[in-house]
């Protein structure tokens, strides 16, 4: 294998090096690992001795005794998609033998069952008790593990320099991992990129976070000079996320002629922070690949009664009068209840202004008193049927539906609850042929976080039939929100995902990015399951 300088050349694309430090920080009785980020070209070098923690001795050694240190995804560092290559290097010493031990591990998400996400160690480095050697284990793109052992038989109490590194071969769509222990190396090849894309957790001292029983703990061992680095692949046109300037969420796409308009909420939460969504943004495209930003088209503050940082999910539709109506979720700053209101514009790129002249919301919580969740009135979706009748669905915990007047800003009939299996929030109504579909965020029994499910009907007024899952939960985040469109003969499934960085800053639960996949149907009209990928629309251009 090439020298690491060739694998990760100077000034290469998006190269990051994580030099881990340790501080004593008690949160949920867990000590966290903190790291400092700098480019490979930086001259500073850090070891564990640079930070004052109890477990570091005068020789810069961290003693591991059933202890756990972890670096959460939401800590202040860019999340690196180390798909081109990565390297982990440390000096390790085993105080006991005979038991398998994991010294350092990168946990990742593996979806072995639809909607049920189990954890698997994307990279694990430790002691293999069957071979008596140090090992590296990686998980490939198909969720299969590959373990490689190298070096001499490990002796208790002796220090070893252990270095694992991997490099992706684009032409072969395969990666080679090399393990070197005290200068003796072995290597193996596994399918796919060097590292799967997912948000995750780096852990020292355990093979699984949280001290689970038999979690491959290091019961008596030492570590020093830990260094972790990696390199991402160049961005490909059409890959996720769609927008790379800011964090975006709650997608609502609308097709007008030969152009698709994407309406999204802007996530401005700080790293690890809670929701802060002051604006709705608009982008446009003629091919779903290249996008033009039109900036802010509406803000929560445009509604006098609304809390200014709650620009929640909504949808834009074009009325019979040619105007564009933006149905949005807001927080009433007086009673803190969610409401649904509507804004209007002569142009799909705004600006939008509140449409109801009396200044009252379109939907308030007193219209849905039978909801089993508080703040039921969120996430409006509007479908204009073939006869010109507009219908709106929404709801948190329960799905509600009402007919709108042709003026688009008043109700035309009673609000009614529509039974939907496993319904959570975020409905999206669309029609294909003679069949109506409602795709929504789902809380299947015993499954978290939210997945995406759907129901279908031959009439907008039902009865509705449960169709099953559309996708798993997002790669990171406890929410997911759908948008479905047909554009230039192709169907698209759009959602948000918190596992992507923007401008060198990490995503998260409240720092999401809008993504897209192709959507297809079976011959009977049911929706085919969608895999959420980083490749996105670049896969079938």
Residues of each region from the PLM?
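A carbohydrate-recognition surface predominantly in extracellular/luminal proteins
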Residues: 75-96, 102, 119-124, 226
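Short surface loop/edge beta-strand patches of beta-sandwich-type extracellular domains
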Residues: 64-86, 147-153
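Glycan-recognition/cleft segments
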Residues: 105-137
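Extracellular, beta-strand-rich glycan-interacting domains
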Residues: 89-94, 213-233
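Carbohydrate-active catalytic/glycan-binding domains of CAZyme proteins
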Residues: 232-541
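Short, aromatic/His-centered strand-loop micro-motif at the edge of beta-sheets
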Residues: 136-161
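Localized edge beta-strand/strand-to-loop motifs within extracellular or lumenal beta-rich domains
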Residues: 158-176
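Flexible glycan-contacting loops in extracellular carbohydrate-active proteins
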Residues: 189-222
């Amino acid at each position: 294998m090439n020298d690491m300088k060739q694998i990760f050349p100077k000034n290469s694309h998006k190269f990051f090096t994580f030099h881990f430090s340790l501080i004593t920080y008690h949160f949920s009785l867990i000590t966290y690992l903190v790291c400092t980020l700098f480019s490979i070209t930086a001259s500073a070098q850090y070891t564990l001795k640079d930070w004052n923690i109890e477990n570091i001795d005068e020789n810069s050694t961290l003693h591991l005794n059933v202890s756990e240190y972890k670096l959460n995804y939401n800590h202040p560092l860019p999340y690196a998609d180390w798909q081109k290559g990565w390297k982990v290097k440390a000096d390790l010493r085993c105080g006991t033998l005979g038991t398998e031990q994991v010294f350092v591990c990168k946990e990742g998400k593996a979806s072995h069952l639809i909607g049920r996400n189990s954890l698997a160690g994307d990279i694990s480095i430790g002691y293999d008790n069957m071979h008596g050697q140090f090992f590296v284990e990686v998980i490939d793109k198909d969720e299969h593990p590959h373990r490689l052992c190298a070096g001499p038989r490990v002796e208790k109490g002796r220090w070893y320099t252990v270095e694992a590194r991997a490099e992706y071969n684009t032409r072969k769509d395969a990666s080679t991992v090399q393990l070197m222990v005290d200068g003796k190396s072995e290597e193996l090849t596994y399918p796919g990129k060097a590292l799967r894309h997912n948000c995750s957790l780096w852990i020292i001292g355990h093979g699984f976070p949280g001290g689970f029983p038999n979690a491959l703990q290091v019961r008596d061992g030492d570590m020093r000079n830990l260094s972790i680095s990696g390199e991402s692949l160049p961005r490909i046109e059409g890959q996720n996320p769609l927008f790379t300037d800011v964090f975006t969420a709650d997608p609502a796409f609308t097709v007008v002629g030969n152009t698709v308009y994407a309406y999204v909420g802007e996530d401005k939460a700080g790293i690890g922070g809670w929701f802060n969504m002051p604006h709705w943004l608009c982008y446009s495209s003629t091919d779903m690949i290249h996008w033009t930003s039109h900036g802010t088209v509406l803000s929560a503050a445009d509604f006098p009664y609304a809390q200014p940082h709650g620009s929640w999910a909504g949808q834009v539709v074009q009325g019979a009068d040619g105007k564009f109506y933006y149905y949005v979720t807001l927080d009433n700053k007086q009673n803190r209840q969610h409401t649904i209101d509507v804004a209007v514009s002569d142009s799909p790129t705004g600006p939008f202004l509140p449409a109801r002249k009396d200044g009252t919301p379109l939907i308030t919580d007193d219209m849905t008193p039978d909801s089993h969740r508080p703040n039921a009135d969120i996430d409006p979706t509007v479908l204009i049927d073939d006869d010109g009748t507009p219908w709106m669905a929404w709801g948190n915990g329960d799905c509600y539906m009402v007919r709108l007047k042709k003026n688009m800003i008043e109700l035309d009939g009673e609000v009614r609850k529509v039974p939907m299996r496993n319904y959570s929030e975020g409905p999206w109504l669309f029609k294909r042929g003679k069949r109506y579909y409602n795709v929504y965020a789902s809380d299947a029994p015993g499954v978290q976080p939210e997945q995406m499910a759907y129901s279908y009907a031959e009439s907008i007024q039902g009865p509705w039939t449960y169709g099953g899952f559309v996708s798993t939960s997002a790669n990171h985040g406890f929410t997911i929100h759908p948008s479905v469109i047909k554009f230039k003969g192709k169907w698209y499934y759009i959602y948000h995902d918190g596992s992507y960085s923007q401008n060198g800053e990490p995503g998260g639960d409240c720092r999401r990015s809008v993504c897209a996949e192709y959507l297809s149907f079976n011959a009977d009209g049911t929706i085919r399951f969608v895999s959420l990928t980083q490749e996105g629309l670049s896969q079938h251009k």
